[in-house]
């Protein structure tokens, strides 16, 4: 068995398979479409998350800020910042290519922030999805 095949087998061990969550509008952004793909690895206690949002209104229309930030919230209510989404204003598209979070069951939230480095959301999230 080659190194690549062995690495792929090792990387796949403990994986639970990708979970796809379809987003079809929210109270604050009715035209929003997209998906969140979460690939949990329960053996390692982590999840790889990808976010792809279409028809996403500019951040200024959804809150007081210029940056979309993705967050996790664990069962105890502790916040974790995943990072800022890449926003393409002309295409009205928001993406986060890939992040690994140290949880396998959590709420994923997206808020609008003036400072993408804050420790917790400062505005009401416009998108909330439970990942499990």
Would you name each region that the model predicts?
Residues 1-15:
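Sec-dependent bacterial lipoprotein signal peptides
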């Amino acid at each position: 068995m080659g190194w690549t095949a062995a690495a792929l087998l090792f990387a796949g061990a403990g994986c639970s398979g990708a979970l796809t969550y379809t987003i079809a509008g929210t109270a604050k952004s009715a035209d929003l479409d997209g998906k969140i793909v979460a690939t949990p690895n329960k053996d390692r206690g982590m999840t790889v998350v990808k976010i792809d949002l279409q028809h996403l209104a500019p951040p200024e229309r959804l809150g007081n800020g210029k940056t979309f930030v993705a967050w996790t919230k664990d069962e105890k209510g502790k916040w974790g910042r995943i990072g800022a989404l890449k926003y393409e204003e002309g295409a009205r598209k928001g993406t986060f290519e890939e992040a690994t979070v140290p949880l396998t069951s959590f709420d994923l939230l997206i808020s609008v922030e003036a400072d993408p480095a804050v420790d917790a959301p400062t505005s009401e999230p416009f998108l909330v999805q439970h990942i499990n």
